Design a protein with these regions (language model features):
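Short, basic, low-complexity termini and linkers enriched in Ser/Thr/Gly/Pro
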Residues: 10-34
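Conserved beta-strand positions in the central sheet of alpha/beta enzyme cores
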Residues: 79, 151, 304-306, 352
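C-terminal accessory regions of radical SAM enzymes
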Residues: 171-289
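Conserved acetyl-CoA binding element of GNAT-fold acetyltransferases
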Residues: 299-326
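Conserved acetyl-CoA-binding loop-helix of GNAT-fold acetyltransferases
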Residues: 321-342
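Conserved GNAT acetyl-CoA-binding A-motif
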Residues: 340-355
Length: 361
């Protein structure tokens, strides 16, 4: 396996109007005079480790040069501010990027092994609930998108934004809570089992919101109504195992096209309870699938493991707990299956694994 070695000198942390912030409680990474490479080496074997780094950026900022810099920084996941898959509305809100740039950024990031998350913002100016639902439907029906994770941030009005004036002038009117909750229920029903909804509301104090939903328990209300109607969200967050949950887990495979390449979503799931214990995202890059040279030579000819994650409560390194999903061999079995698929089905001679610095030991 190849843990995405860096061949260039470490870059400084700062990315064209995008802030690279590493939030951690690890003193090993907070030493003021430590060079990035030295801090990364220390973190590989530290008692407390940073095992992944996520950054947020705009789709139009993503190019091959930027991606190389993200690799140097140890980034493992990139969140794109997609907002809505509708060029008319993106132009209206002066977003200054297009859906074509969202698709291009997604393909570059996937082919470099990153996990990809989207931010969607229902209730933007010019949008209707039907527009928002169509955007969510396209998100997973169109293979040019299909993100791994999703954050839903319904639009609200704050005084510091230009939208505040639009609202005062009557040019913008947010959805009422009833409309918003029903829209979110419909959106959650569209999300496939390989994707994860991480957020359903943004943490903005209700005292700062002039218009729009001020409900801090929006996700809970959506889930309550879905349960009352016998509906279930099948996103990963709603299905992942909780502390101490028993289960009989079997290896499950889902294949789908994405960004010009092929994805195999491998997982250990309990069919009876629809719980998920462990997952692996394996990718045949678009370059390899279409017999083109990879623009990143270190990944030439390799299938990519973009994520390996076991859920449940944390178990220490080299430890085991009978009531936990971690350290039961699920991850090892998924890696072995990924190697088999890459070698026997896709004709790849090697696998490259993107891993957080603290997960490489």
């Amino acid at each position: 396996a190849n843990n995405f070695p860096t061949q260039e000198p470490a870059a400084q942390c700062g990315m064209r109007n995008a802030e690279c912030g590493i939030e951690n409680g690890h003193s090993e990474l907070r030493t003021p005079n430590s060079a990035l490479e030295q801090a990364q080496r220390v973190n590989e074997t530290a008692a407390s480790r940073t095992i992944g780094v996520t950054i947020e950026t705009r789709p139009d900022y993503v190019d091959e040069t930027e991606i190389r810099r993200l690799r140097e920084l140890g980034v493992t996941r990139v969140e794109l501010g997609a907002q809505i898959l509708n060029d008319r509305i993106l132009e209206l809100i002066v977003r200054d990027h297009t859906t074509a740039e969202i698709r291009h950024a997604t393909q570059l990031l996937r082919d470099a092994g990153f996990k990809v998350a989207y931010h969607l913002m229902p209730n933007l100016p010019g949008a209707t609930p039907d527009d928002d639902l169509a955007s969510c439907r396209a998100l997973f029906e169109d293979p040019a998108y299909r993100p791994d994770t999703l954050k839903l941030y319904p639009c609200v009005v704050v005084k510091s934004a230009e939208l505040y004036q639009w609202w005062q002038d009557g040019r913008y009117q947010p959805y009422d809570d009833e409309t918003l909750v029903e829209l979110l229920i419909a959106m959650k029903r569209l999300v496939p089992p390989y994707a994860r909804i991480e957020r359903v509301i943004r943490d903005i104090p209700s005292t700062s919101i002039e218009a729009g939903s001020k409900r801090t328990n929006l996700r809970e209300e959506v889930q309550r109504r879905m349960r009352a109607r016998g509906l279930a969200c099948r996103c990963i967050r709603c299905r992942q195992v909780r502390d101490g949950e028993p289960g009989t887990f079997t290896l499950t495979r889902r294949d789908f096209e994405a960004s010009g390449g092929q994805e195999a979503f491998l997982s250990f799931e309990d069919a009876a309870t629809d719980r998920l214990a462990c997952l692996l995202r394996l990718r045949l890059p678009s370059t390899l699938r279409n017999r083109h040279p990879h623009w990143m030579p270190v990944l030439e000819g390799a299938a990519l493991v973009r994520e390996l994650h076991t859920y449940g409560h944390h178990v220490g390194i080299h430890q085991r707990a009978d009531d936990a999903a971690q350290h039961r061999g699920f991850g090892k079995q998924l890696i072995e299956e990924a190697e088999r698929i890459a070698r026997q089905e896709w004709g790849c001679q090697r696998i490259a694994v993107i891993a957080g610095v603290g997960a490489r030991e």
